[in-house]
Amino acid sequence: MMAAALGPPEVIAQLENAAKVLMAPPSMVSNEQRQHAEHIFLSFRKSKSPFAVCRHILETSKVDYVLFQAATAIMEAVVREWVLLEKGSIESLRTFLLTYVLQRPNLQKYVREQILLAVAVIVKRGSLDKSIDCKSIFHEVSQLISSGNPTVQTLACSILTALLSEFSSSSKTSNIGLSMEFHGNCKRVFQEEDLRQIFMLTVGVLQEFSRRENLSAQMSSVFQRYLALANQVLSWNFLPPKLGRHYIAMFESSQNVLLKPTESWREALLDSRVMELFFTVHRKIREDSDMAQDSLQCLAQLASLHGPIFPDEGSQVDYLAHFIEGLLNTINGIEIEDSEAVGISSIISNLITVFPRNVLTAIPSELFSSFVNCLTHLTCSFGRSAALEEVLDKDDMVYMEAYDKLLESWLTLVRDDKHFHKGFFTQHAVQVFNSYIQCHLAAPDGTRNLTANGVASREEEEISELQEDDRDQFSDQLASVGMLGRIAAEHCMPLLTSLLEERVTRLHGQLQRHQQQFLASPGSSTIDNKMLDDLYEDIHWLILVTGYLLADDTQGETPLIPPEIMEYSIKHSSEVDINTTLQILGSPGEKASSIPGYSRTDSVIRLLSAVLRVSEVESRAIRADLTHLLSPQMGKDIVWFLKRWAKTYLLVDEKLYDQISLPLSTAFGADTEGSQWIIGYLLQKVISNLSVWSSEQDLANDTVQLLVTLVERRERANLVIQCENWWNLAKQFASRSPPLNFLSSPVQRTLMKALVLGGFAHMDTETKQQYWTEVLQPLQQRFLRVINQENFQQMCQQEEVKQEITATLEALCGIAEATQIDNVAILFNFLMDFLNNCIGLMEVYKNTPETVNLIIEVFVEVAHKQICYLGESKAMHLYEACLTLLQVYSKNNLGRQRIDVTAEEEQYQDLLLIMELLTNLLSKEFIDFSDTDEVFRGHEPGQAAGRSVSAADVVLYGVNLILPLMSQDLLKFPTLCNQYYKLITFICEIFPEKIPQLPEDLFKSLMYSLELGMTSMSSEVCQLCLEALTPLAEQCAKAQETDSPLFLATRHFLKLVFDMLVLQKHNTEMTTAAGEAFYTLVCLHQAEYSELVETLLSSQQDPVIYQRLADAFNKLTASSTPPALDRKQKMAFLKSLEEFMANVGGLLCVK
């Protein structure tokens, strides 16, 4: 258009003026001028056959931005008009562009890159119909390389990089309006031949450079460019031969690409000289940190080589042996640079995880032994450097990252007992374990806080305040070190025991000295805490390692004593004196070594006893009023350890083990004095902590978690309730007396949960009645006393009244959290009385959001924990209560505007909680353990004959309430958005028959929400909406009402899903959900489906594509019978759809 109307000089003048406008500061030009300038460039790029004008621009214009746009116009027009262009003119255009760049070494980088990209696109488009191949380009590039001119060699590298980027993945390709299938096919063709050619050219350059002695700065820069190119080739994500476009997208999104080339690469990569070259290159440039990153990444990729490239196992063994030799030659005897640590650990990690273990063990044994020794040496060395980074509080923790990788590699090796005999890694494990302990202990035993020159580091306090808890931050490291400790239990357990016992003695001595000093001169406060701080930090790390060594983190599984620990205890049981062992366990106040025959104790029990001795010193210091000298961190470590230990060892269940250690079963088995004693001891610890440390929230929380562990298993709870302390704790908490009433809300909630769980231990009826009277009744009485006061309305905002109400609501949440199938009957009836009163509180506190939220949260917890056990009549009571709650909430929120878009998500906590409540009520339809009120036998059985309220009523009423409030602004909050869509999907799945009966406004809002979720939200939300469509379409098919709003809405959704599957890119995971919805919608709207297919086919200009699409659609619905809602037919359709997506999915999805 534009080019035809004006001559080249005028076009250039117009473009240069437009460029000036675009480059001008915002204050100098108006929006209209800017838009007009943009429009000029857009229409220029769309003009027909702009090649001559573009050549003229490139040769005459001096404005970089205009040159850039000319290159872009050429690239887009070549693809657009490909079929109309002569092969010769395409070839001359490509030659012109290359020559142009060659002759102008001073071009701006972004202009040069864009011109080379145009060349790459021409080559790519030509590769498909074989009209242009890369050979001529490679010939030209190899001539440029051999010129010896650094500028020209750099240009050659830029050409190869442009080709590589264009072909490498669909995410990096230019947006040139071609199908994803086309991009995938080009990549496959390219990776077989041309990619290898680029690699060989690159290897040639690297060989040439590695032979040279001295490189000028310019030559080094060229060397670096080619090394980066080699890295790009070796990090290529090789596409398997057949892969649909969705799978291509998923395949290419994987982060850590391992090297898996095709067979055609054997000669290039299995040639030992190639591997040697990369080791040589690294040795040459290792002191240049930027280049070292690339050379190590190349080696890490070569260390991950796998797949069809290896003809047999023998070739794999040879390759691996050769690689390990090269690696050892490179790193033995050198001081590793900081910039090499992560790269070297990646190489080792890849070798250990990618090569099968039988290949690893097949290399010469001496070589394997040297490799493991090297791994041991590096792990210890990186561990020391990582500890140093911690001390210096560095931002870039390279050694920590490298150390983590190596510890993971150890875990892979030591867990494999098929290929390595027992004890194979023991000595190495000892070295790594020792070095870890050494790095975490203060001098003189360890090197913690010593900088490289042996000087103590800056104050520890500054650092520890800023960081998350070590047990979370370093959990992976601790798990690996704990595992290595088990492998070498013979060494590690006695070591930990002696280190802990020795520090307990020193801590006891230090605290005594402080006490004497204080008694001698009460006013003096010249206490040097340095020694105490060092001791606390030592004990902190020793307890963490001990916890990870003795027990595993078990989530949702039955915790078992690790087999290595059990075997170790059994192996030495003949040398153990049980009575002495029990004496050491039962006298934590005495020094272990002062007990006669102390050396004949079980090592596992002795190690636990060492931690109990730490705990005892803490308790004695508290009794001696030295709490101010204690470390809350140590208190946390102790209860964390005791909880972890108790879950696994306390009342050990012999049925779970093939063989059991006699000392462990005697000390901690059922019906033993040892277990009764330790439960009493732990309970005392809990009570003491809650009194002394009530203001330390984390410590109090860890303490109540230990209490829950003691009562969550019935067998342990039976022992707990025999302790008088337990009853005292229950009474104290129920009376809300200090210091328990100072505990934070979450801690009080968990404490209530523990007290309720304890109440279901085995007791006679009278005792149980007495227990509930002391634990639950005071809660009820105090609550009723407060709310039934005549002037409650006036007093409700007083601080002590609000505190009482809050404490009661928190306690109710705790009671609900304690629900189990065998206690739900009692707890439900108890809680229902409260729920009705809570609704009244909603009125009183309607302007106090935090109280309103807490009231709703009580309902959320009750529904979440109990609904699945409730029979019909009980469930109805809960539904009625929830409905009343929603009605009150609705009345109080009428007309309340939520317009503050900048508000934080917390301000919408009430909406979130209501949605959670509705979702929990719906879950009854999925998970129902009730047996028509069977669990309530004897608890007012009550019939539901005159059912008045159903879950559907409550939930739809709730949705009616929520929908008008859920603006698009609110949906920007991810948690709100996900909870909202989860809820509406549930409703469509469970009550599809209720959807057509919704009021018109509500129905429209719901349909709009589904469309919004499918088109504008995350893939997770889109999937939920697709899952909602299937039941809605099925409902329509059942109702057979072709004029209903739902029928019309599903017709609209058919087009949306059709477009999504056929025309748009989307995640593979969604294909199944989309496919199911699509099938149901096609069954419902067969004529409309045929129309959509016809429209799509008639818009195709290319006869080949037309035919392929027509055949694919025919095959998709090939069945002679029309599609019907039949499971067998549906499954056949989904299978055909998968084939359809693989064959033509990429044809219409363009980029």
UniProtKB/Swiss-Prot annotation:
Highest taxon, organism lineage: Eukaryota
GO BP annotation list: protein transport
UniProt xrefs under Pfam families: CRM1_C
Name of the protein described by the UniProt record: Exportin-4
Cellular component terms per the entry's GO annotation: cytoplasm; nucleus
Record InterPro entries: ARM-like, ARM-type_fold, XPO1_C_dom, XPO4/7-like
Reported function: Mediates the nuclear export of proteins (cargos), such as EIF5A, SMAD3 and isoform M2 of PKM (PKM2). In the nucleus binds cooperatively to its cargo and to the GTPase Ran in its active GTP-bound form. Docking of this trimeric complex to the nuclear pore complex (NPC) is mediated through binding to nucleoporins. Upon transit of a nuclear export complex into the cytoplasm, disassembling of the complex and hydrolysis of Ran-GTP to Ran-GDP (induced by RANBP1 and RANGAP1, respectively) cause release of the cargo from the export receptor.
Similarity remark: Belongs to the exportin family.
Sorted UniProt keywords: Cytoplasm, Nucleus, Phosphoprotein, Protein transport, Transport
Residues modified as Phosphoserine: S464, S521
